[in-house]
């Protein structure tokens, strides 16, 4: 036996006069119709028939009225079937320059060039004025002076320390004079 439907009760917690609208339950027929519609929509979720082969009708509806290129068609540039004697000069890449060997200077020329180097002169003047050079300048001075020494040795030129030579000669003269005179204490 079926029991009779109960009468809806009012919401006890809500104040009177603010009743919520009553929801109407859907009938079985309405539920079945909605289910059929959902199933129909789900069934047709893919591309329409022929979408893969008919490129014209694909996703670009109404964007432009001009006829768009078919992506399946390749280039329309004619391919020459016979090799002609005159071929268009294609832009040749610039030839890579080989390491150009600079003409070597003779040792005399290189030595003269290094001795007349303005940068070296300026740096040596700064060193004479007791200035401290940075690493790059100091390395340049050291390398250049080492090269000058090597070239002078190669050419057989001795470093002219005139002061040392003069002092040696004076000492020899002094010794000879002392020997000729006798005892140096006697002269005073």
Curated annotation (Swiss-Prot):
Q: Does the keyword Cell wall biogenesis/degradation apply?
A: no
InterPro entries per UniProt: YihI (IPR007336)
Q: Which GO terms describe its biological process?
A: ribosome biogenesis
**Cytoplasm among keywords:** no
Region annotation (Disordered) ranges: 1-80, 162-188
Q: Enumerate composition-biased segments (Basic and acidic residues).
A: 27-37
Q: Which UniProt keywords apply?
A: GTPase activation, Ribosome biogenesis
Function of the protein: A GTPase-activating protein (GAP) that modifies Der/EngA GTPase function. May play a role in ribosome biogenesis.
- Per its UniProt record, what NCBIfam families does this chain match? PRK05244.1-1 (NF003560)
Family statement drawn from the similarity comment of this UniProt entry: Belongs to the YihI family.
The protein, known as: Der GTPase-activating protein YihI
Organism lineage = Bacteria, Pseudomonadati, Pseudomonadota, Gammaproteobacteria, Enterobacterales
Q: Which gene encodes it?
A: yihI
């Amino acid at each position: 036996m079926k029991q009779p439907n109960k009468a809806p009760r009012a919401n006890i917690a809500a104040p009177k006069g603010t009743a919520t609208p009553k929801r109407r339950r859907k009938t079985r027929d309405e539920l079945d119709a909605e289910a059929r519609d959902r199933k129909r929509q789900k069934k047709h979720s893919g591309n329409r028939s022929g979408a893969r082969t008919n490129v014209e009708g694909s996703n670009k509806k109404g964007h432009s009225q001009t006829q768009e290129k078919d992506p399946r068609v390749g280039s329309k540039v004619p391919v020459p079937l016979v090799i002609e004697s005159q071929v268009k000069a294609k832009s040749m890449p610039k030839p890579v320059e080989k390491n150009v060997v600079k003409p070597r200077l003779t040792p005399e020329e290189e030595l003269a060039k290094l001795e007349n180097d303005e940068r070296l002169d300026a740096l040596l003047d700064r060193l004479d004025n007791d200035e401290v050079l940075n690493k790059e300048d100091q390395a340049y001075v050291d390398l250049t002076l080492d090269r000058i020494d090597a070239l002078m040795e190669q050419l057989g030129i001795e470093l002219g320390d005139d002061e040392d030579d003069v002092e040696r000669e004076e000492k020899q003269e002094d010794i000879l004079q002392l020997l000729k005179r006798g005892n140096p204490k006697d002269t005073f």
